[in-house]
Amino acid sequence: MDFTSSSGVLDSERNTGSNDSDEPSSHSDVIETEELKLIKLQEHKNNLLRQRSELLDQLSQTRVVEPRSVQLDDKLLLKLLRRNDNAVSDSSQSSNNPLPRVLPSLNIEQRKKYLDITLNDVTVTCEKDMILLRKGSFTASFRIAVENESIRSMAIDLNAFEVELQPIIQYAEDTQNVNVAMMAVVQFLRIKELHEQMISKIVEASKFIRASNNTITLNDLEVSFHCYWNLPSPYPETLILTNKVQKILDFLIYQYGIQLGVIKYGSTII
């Protein structure tokens, strides 16, 4: 018998079978490729979510600070409050002489020479044994007793903002540092003014309404502006709190700044 033909047929069948078996193998490769893509996409998504979670954790531990856009006359204030080892200069000498190591208290004329000054809308004057710092209706009085050019005692009285200023005032009284106290009060008044401007702009550009001096609301959502003291620095920092999801507010402020961040937060939460 001629087995060539049958052998050829068998080979052909084998080849055919081999070709047929290749097709599902090829299809399987396609499926695996698509699955691999999905796996990679899921891994990328998980990485993004993990990075976002880490960023939010970092933001939750970071105080949000608004850049001080208000023009400050700190050079004058620093000149007023700076320390110097030289003794109190004679009133007949030039006003450009270095300031005394402590604010002069025993000599009223000397004290008036250095402290009767206006910094824009903030006025610092002397009355009897007190230094008075005024801005509008606000008054802070600093009563200090000096002995041998060192402050022996100091008392600070405020006619407003006692709670907000309490940490820095307590620190200044404990350390008898009138320079820090005066600088802190001036900077606090200015940052309160900055908060007022920001709140007005947010209310004007959004559906938020003003609930109090430092709080705005949108339905049951509240956002409030506060000052935070990072002692011993006399410069207060801005702290913005909400009664809803704090991390989202912090993230949006970090991304867009305070004004736009608060507005976006309102439209996101409501």
Swiss-Prot record:
Listed GO biological process terms: cell division; meiotic cell cycle
Keywords: Cell cycle, Cell division, Centromere, Chromosome, Coiled coil, Kinetochore, Meiosis, Mitosis, Nucleus
Record's compositionally biased regions (Polar residues): 1-19
Renumbered residue ranges of the record's region D-RWD: 107-270
Superkingdom of source: Eukaryota
Coiled-coil zones: 31-63
CDD domains referenced in this protein's UniProt entry, alphabetically: DRWD-C_KlCTF19, DRWD-N_KlCTF19
GO cellular component: kinetochore; nucleus
Renumbered residue ranges of the record's region Disordered: 1-30
Cellular localization per UniProt: Nucleus; Chromosome, Centromere, Kinetochore
One Pfam family it belongs to: Ctf19_RWD2
Family: Belongs to the CENP-P/CTF19 family.
Function, in words: Component of the kinetochore, a multiprotein complex that assembles on centromeric DNA and attaches chromosomes to spindle microtubules, mediating chromosome segregation and sister chromatid segregation during meiosis and mitosis. Component of the inner kinetochore COMA subcomplex, which connects centromere-associated proteins and the outer kinetochore. COMA interacts with other inner kinetochore proteins to form the inner kinetochore constitutive centromere-associated network (CCAN), which serves as a structural platform for outer kinetochore assembly.
Subunit structure: Component of the heterotetrameric kinetochore subcomplex COMA, which consists of AME1, CTF19, MCM21 and OKP1. The COMA subcomplex is part of a larger constitutive centromere-associated network (CCAN) (also known as central kinetochore CTF19 complex in yeast), which is composed of at least AME1, CHL4, CTF3, CTF19, IML3, MCM16, MCM21, MCM22, NKP1, NKP2 and OKP1. COMA binds the centromeric nucleosome-binding protein MIF2, and to the outer kinetochore MIND subcomplex.
Domain notes: The D-RWD region contains a double-RWD domain which is involved in the interaction with other kinetochore proteins.
Protein name: Inner kinetochore subunit CTF19
Gene for this chain: CTF19
